[in-house]
Amino acid sequence: MGACLLDAFETILTCDFTTYRRELPVLAGIPADVMFEEFGRIAPALTDGRLSLAAGYDHILRTCGAGPRPELVRALMDRGIELLSASGRLFEDVRPFMAGLRARGIKIAIVSNCDEQVRGLLGSLGVTPLADALVLSCEVGAAKPSPRIFERALEVLGVSAEAALFVDDNPGFCAGATALGIRAAHLVRGEPGAQAPAGGATVVRSLADVEAMLSA
C-alpha cells in the first residue's frame, strides 16, 4: 500500500463547537439561531469553494441586517479560527498512526470537506507536518463523495487508486472512494453495532485496525 487518505473531522480530530456557536453571534450582533441557519444555507458553497469565508460572513451580515461591515468580517474570521483551534483535539491514536505510516514510507493526505478555516486548524493541531498533502474541498472545488477530490489526492501523492486506502467516518464518502477503485475503511469509533456500509468498505474501530489493513 503506497498511500493513506484520511478524513479530518471525527476521523483524526474532533471539535467542541459550543464556544464557537456562542461567541461568534455575539460578535456579529446577530441571534445565534438566525446566524447559523444562514450558515447552513451557504455551507455547500463554502465547502466546495464557490464562496470564500469572507464572502460568506459578508453575506450573513447583509442578510441578517448587520452589514456591510468589512472590519467585522475580518474580526469574525480571526476570532472564528481562534475558537476553532482552541476547541479542536486529535484522537489519541492519530499521532502514532501517522508517524508509523511515515516511517514505513506510506504517503499521507488529509482529504476533508471543509471551508478555508480548516487549513489553519490542521496547522494548529500539528497535523500539517505529519501529512504529505492537505486536499481540502474548498480548494479543490469539489467535495466528497465527488470523484474529483479523490482524484486530486491521488494526483498530488503520485499513486494509483489501487495503491491507496481511504479512511472516513462517513459510509457514503467511503462508497465514493471505492467507486474509483480505492480501498476504504469506514471508521466507527465507539459504535460496536455498526454494520459494513454499502460499497465494499471495511468497518474498523480504530486506526490500529487501519494499520493492520495497510499491512495486509
Residue ranges of predicted features:
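Asp-based, Mg2+/Mn2+-dependent phosphohydrolase catalytic module
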Residues: 1-6, 95, 99-100, 109-216
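N-terminal helical cap/lid subdomain that shapes the substrate entry/recognition surface
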Residues: 1-95, 103-104
